[in-house]
A protein has these predicted regions:
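Outer-membrane beta-barrel "beta-signal"
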Residues: 213, 326-330, 335, 350-363
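Sec/Tat signal peptide C-region and signal peptidase I cleavage site
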Residues: 51-55
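Solvent-exposed loop/turn segments connecting transmembrane beta-strands
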Residues: 73-78, 105-115, 168-170, 198-205, ...
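Outer membrane beta-barrel
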Residues: 57-195, 205-210, 214-221, 226, ...
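Extracytoplasmic loops and strand-loop junctions of Gram-negative outer membrane beta-barrel proteins
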Residues: 69, 157-162, 240-246, 340-342
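C-terminal hydrophobic structural anchor segments
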Residues: 293, 297-345
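Detector for outer-membrane/organellar transmembrane beta-barrel domains
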Residues: 215-312
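Short, low-complexity, charge-dense intrinsically disordered segments
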Residues: 1-19, 23-39, 46-47
């Protein structure tokens, strides 16, 4: 689907430079309002690399780039670097469990390709139980927890990008999360976070609480069926929800969100869907997506999807989007070429977006 920021960008071309400037600078304003925090995280990142090198521990580094061409058939035709991510991680095994860490950064086009830290975390795991602390993506929404390089389409659904709790700051927050994960029966997690996003110092005493659970109804090598739910709550104070309300709106009040999810695997066929609802005070934003894909001859992936988001911004169009996607897996997800065609049939016009993307892993 066409992300909401692209729709706002398209509308702004018809309303002058002021709106266009606001659309581009909103994420930049959110992510850079505390430069000291960015400096501290960068220092930790470099210190971790140096410490690992001095200790002669093996540090695993990884990275990938998504380079794309897109055309909305109206006023936007461009080449862009959608993502350029780099991360290091390591594992320290112990007799009664194992410690691991991860530090990940991304060059974001939306903020003029600034180098921003996304994940700074440490994890302890023993058997099926694990604890994660730091800055990372809270366990809310099936598709949001799936890596963007592994999803069958070029972008996650609008409802996921807009309604997960940390949507305004790369879906990340700072906190602690406990998780019990059994590969045969399902998983259960509970976490509490600052609640005002990534790379940001908390200025309140009210946490964001997140809970997710899933259960396998069918689980064997040939077929799997998993159902799940998501819950989150925070007492929000002056938090920007631009992906729900639009720019320059700060929300204060009860923020309660929930969702349901489903994933079915039958050999080369996969069906996945989610419904998410956000209650902000006495207002409600909600939406869904349903996605089906089939892998032909191990390298050809065909995807069909439909999604719809009802936000609280009166200037956006709420009609559903339909997607037809094709990916050629040259070397699995390590080298992949994909073509997505997205359509929205509004009351007075048809919106469309075509995206051609190449994904390449550096390591």
């Amino acid at each position: 689907m066409i992300p909401k920021f692209l729709l706002r960008k398209t509308q702004c071309y018809h309303s002058g430079n002021l709106c266009k400037k606001k659309s581009y600078t909103e994420l930049h304003r959110v992510l850079t309002k505390n430069h000291r925090v960015k400096f501290i995280f960068t220092f930790i990142f470099l210190l971790a690399l140096g410490t690992a090198s001095l200790a002669q521990q093996k540090v695993n580094w990884n990275g990938y780039m998504q380079y794309r061409f897109s055309d909305n058939y109206l006023n936007q035709t461009e080449f862009s670097v959608r993502r350029a991510k780099f991360w290091v991680n390591g594992l320290i095994p112990e007799e009664d469990g194992s410690w691991s860490y991860k530090l990940q950064a991304n060059f974001l086009q939306q903020v003029k390709y600034q180098f921003l830290l996304q994940d700074v975390l440490v994890n302890y795991k023993i058997n099926n139980f694990e604890v994660t602390a730091g800055q990372f993506v809270p366990d809310f929404s099936l598709q949001r927890k799936q890596p963007d390089y592994a999803i069958p389409l070029d972008e996650r659904a609008d409802v996921v990008n807009a309604l997960v709790p940390g949507a305004e700051t790369m879906a990340r927050d700072i906190g602690v999360e406990l998780k019990l994960d059994d590969s045969k029966t399902g998983s259960f997690s509970f976490g509490f976070f600052n609640g005002n996003g990534a790379n940001t110092v908390s200025n309140q005493r009210n946490f964001l609480y997140v809970n997710r659970g899933s259960l396998f109804l069918l689980n064997n090598p040939e077929s799997k069926l998993e159902l799940g739910y998501n819950l989150s709550y925070r007492d929000a104070h002056n938090i920007q929800f631009s992906k729900i309300y639009g720019n320059n709106y700060a929300f204060t009040g009860n923020d309660f969100r929930f969702g349901f999810e489903e994933k079915l695997n039958l050999g080369a066929f996969e069906l996945q869907s989610e419904y998410i609802e956000a209650h902000l005070g006495n207002q409600k934003a909600y939406g869904y997506y349903a996605l089906a894909d089939y892998l032909f001859v191990s390298k050809n992936l065909v995807t069909l999807s439909v999604e719809q988001l009802y936000d609280l911004n009166p200037s956006t169009i709420n009609d559903p989007w339909y997607v037809v996607g094709y990916s050629y897996l040259i070397k699995g997800n390590n080298i992949k070429i994909s073509l997505d065609n997205k359509f929205q049939f509004a009351s007075n016009k048809t919106n469309a977006l075509t995206t051609l993307q190449i994904q390449y892993f550096f390591n």
